[in-house]
A protein has these predicted regions:
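C-terminal transmembrane helix-loop-helix hairpin of multi-pass membrane proteins
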Residues: 140-150, 168-185
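Short helix-perturbing small/polar motifs within transmembrane alpha-helices
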Residues: 109-157
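Alpha-helix C-terminal capping segments
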Residues: 74-81
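Cytoplasmic-side transmembrane-helix entry/capping segments in multi-pass membrane proteins
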Residues: 37-46, 69-70, 84-87, 106-113, ...
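Interfacial aromatic-anchored transmembrane helix boundaries in multi-pass membrane proteins
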Residues: 56-64, 88-119
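Small-polar-interrupted transmembrane alpha-helices in polytopic inner-membrane proteins
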Residues: 48-52, 82-95
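Hydrophobic transmembrane alpha-helices
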Residues: 2-73
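Membrane-helix interface motif
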Residues: 157-167
Length: 185
């Protein structure tokens, strides 16, 4: 679910960067408000590396293949560290593997990072009860992960269908996008 360079108009790519900047700022602000903000940096670094590496594990799902995303896991485990971690992972995926692109990095960060933050808040709901047992934690972990993937696929679909460039056969592209979105969900 990486949007490559050249698919979206320049204005949409710019809007993606403009929307990413305040989310990164807010995430870093929330991180700095923690009692010891440096304590979770090693955990964030390891999960950022895992997010980067698992993009090489492809699972064939006709008519395409999918790879592990881990944005729900990053959101549940890292909290506000998840958005900067995903942004860094997407940057290295774009530079080294050509998954996505540098012009669409902001849009791809929104597509993957915002659902991770939502997954974090879903996973925190397990603490409503006094004692979150293993079953409760498992249920909320599943909900967080599946909501993150579903929201990412939904954002991907909405952005591509709404803002596809004029140089494409729009009807064929939309049919392909709908098919691939269903395959991802």
């Amino acid at each position: 679910m990486h949007i490559p360079d050249g698919i979206l108009p320049a204005a949409v790519c710019g809007a993606g960067y403009a929307a990413t900047a305040p989310i990164v700022w807010y995430s870093v602000r929330k991180i700095n408000q923690e009692a010891n903000p440096r304590e979770s940096i090693p955990k964030a670094a390891i999960l950022t590396a895992a997010f980067f590496v698992v993009s090489w594990i492809h699972i064939p799902v006709p008519p395409t293949s999918v790879h592990l995303v881990l944005n729900g896991l990053l959101g549940a485990v890292l909290g506000y560290y998840a958005f900067p971690a995903i942004l860094i992972g997407l940057f290295f995926q774009a530079v080294m593997f050509q998954h996505g692109g540098l012009t669409t990095l902001g849009v791809n960060a929104i597509v993957m990072g915002v659902p991770a933050l939502i997954a974090y808040h879903i996973f925190r709901l397990r603490n409503i009860r006094r004692e979150a047992g293993r079953i409760t934690t498992g249920i909320f972990g599943f909900l967080a992960g599946s909501c993150a993937i579903g929201l990412s696929a939904g954002l991907f679909l909405v952005i591509l269908v709404s803002f596809i460039g004029p140089g494409f056969d729009v009807e064929v592209e939309r049919a392909a996008i709908y098919t691939l979105a269903v395959a991802h969900v």
